[in-house]
Amino acid sequence: MAGHSKWANIKHRKAKQDASRGKVFTKYIREIVTAAKLGGADPASNPRLRAVVEKALSVNMTRDTINRAIQRGVGGEDNDDLKEVTYEGYGVGGVAVLVETMTDNLNRTVPDVRHCFSKTNGNLGTAGSVAYLFTKRGEITFDDISLEDKIMDVALEAGAEDIEVSEDEILVITSPETFGEVQDALAAAGLKSDNAEVVMSPSTKAEITDIDQAKQVMKLIDMLEDLDDVQNVYTNVEFSDEVLAQLDA
C-alpha cells in the first residue's frame, strides 16, 4: 500500500501543477466520444463513460459540452478515424511505462512518443514488452478514512475484490466488469468517492532511490502527458521516501 500512497501523492502533485485547462478538456472530450461510441450513451450502463463524465464535471466542463461529445460518439461524427493505441517502454532505472493514446494519425503519434523516451534516456519497446507487468482493474478512492467500516461492508457486498486503507485514503479495488456495480452500490449508500476509474495497475514496482533518475522519470511522464494524443500514462515507479521528499520540495 505504501507504493500506492507514494504514487498517489505524485499524481496529486502533478494534477495540481497541470494548468492547461484546454488540453485537459480536449483529452476528456476524446475519451467521452470514444466511450460513448464503444459502450453507448447511457452512463448508467457504461462505466467507462460514467467515469470520464465525472472527471470532466470535476474540472468544470459544462453538461452541454459533455452531451455534445456523447452525441458525437453515438452518432459516429468526426471520430471514425480515431484509434486507441497503447505504447510500451522503459524509463531509467527499469521503470515500466504504458502510454494510452487516442489518435487519428499514427505517423504523428509514434515519433512524438518515441521522442519522449529518447530525451529522458528511456526506450520505446515493442507490444507486450511491459504490458504483462500491469493488471486492468477498477479503483474507487475515498479521502475520508473514518468511513472505512461502511465502505468495506457496502463494497464487499457489491462484489469488490479488495480494500486497502492507508493513512490518507481508502482504496476499493474491483474487476473491470464489476466496477460500475460497486460504484453504484457505494453511491446508493450515500458514499461519494473522491475518484473512480479503471486503470492499469502495476503488479511489481521499480523503486527509484536516486534523485536524478527520479527527475528523469518525472520528466518522461510530464512530456508524455503534454502530448495531445496521450490519454493516460501508467508506470510501476515507486520513489523512496527521501526521493519523494526532494521531488515535493
From Swiss-Prot:
Pfam families: TACO1_YebC_N (PF20772), Transcrip_reg (PF01709). It comes from the Bacteria. One of its GO terms (cellular component) is cytosol. GO terms for molecular function: DNA binding. One of its GO terms (biological process) is regulation of DNA-templated transcription. The keyword Cytoplasm applies. SUPFAM superfamilies: YebC-like. The keyword DNA-binding applies. It is found in: Cytoplasm. Keywords: Cytoplasm, DNA-binding, Transcription, Transcription regulation. PANTHER family: TRANSCRIPTIONAL REGULATORY PROTEIN YEBC-RELATED, TRANSLATIONAL ACTIVATOR OF CYTOCHROME C OXIDASE 1. Belongs to the TACO1 family. HAMAP family: Transcrip_reg_TACO1 (MF_00693). This is Probable transcriptional regulatory protein A1S_1496. It comes from Acinetobacter baumannii (strain ATCC 17978 / DSM 105126 / CIP 53.77 / LMG 1025 / NCDC KC755 / 5377).
